[in-house]
A protein has these predicted regions:
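Conserved hydrophobic/aromatic beta-strand scaffold that supports enzyme active sites
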Residues: 25-27, 38-42, 59, 75, ...
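Extracellular/periplasmic catalytic domains that process cell-envelope and extracellular macromolecules
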Residues: 19-20, 32-34, 53, 77, ...
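Glycine- and acidic-residue-biased ligand/ion/polar-headgroup-sensing regions
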Residues: 44-47, 54-73
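Ligand-binding loop in jelly-roll beta-barrel domains
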Residues: 88-108
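Residues that flank catalytic or metal-binding motifs in active/ligand-binding sites
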Residues: 24, 55-58, 63, 90, ...
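A short, N-terminal "cap"/entry segment at the start of jelly-roll beta-barrel domains
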Residues: 1-35
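Conserved short histidine dyad/triad with adjacent acidic residue
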Residues: 29, 34-53, 87-91
């Protein structure tokens, strides 16, 4: 599937693959190594990604649970239905809610 195609993706029936302990992803389109890409990502309850940055801008919409975000400006709980844009190169910490984790759509 290319970016020019009509794409329908259902997170309830998507096939997720473990990326690292506490994180699993389901690619919708693109290439996660070469970019750009989009997919569903799950953070296990209490997952801690630590401080990091991304090469490109990351756009995400939380679908279930809560994505925990923190940078020098403070901490934000990004809940179901919320949108977050993280600029490429911006150092931040992220994680999943301690009880529910997080399910979100992510695009670069």
């Amino acid at each position: 599937m290319g970016r020019g195609a009509v794409i329908f993706a259902d997170s309830r029936t998507a096939s997720f693959k473990a990326l690292m302990p506490g994180v699993s992803t389901s690619l919708i389109w693109g290439d996660t190594v070469k970019g750009p890409y989009a997919g569903f990502t799950k953070f296990a309850p209490g997952f801690d990604a630590g401080m990091h940055s991304h090469t490109n801008d990351v756009l995400l919409v939380v679908m279930n649970g809560a994505y925990l975000y923190k940078d020098d400006a403070g901490e934000k709980r990004v809940g179901a239905g919320d949108f977050l844009r993280i600029p490429g190169g911006h150092k931040h910490w992220s994680g999943g809610d301690a009880k529910e984790g997080a399910l979100f759509y992510q695009e670069t």
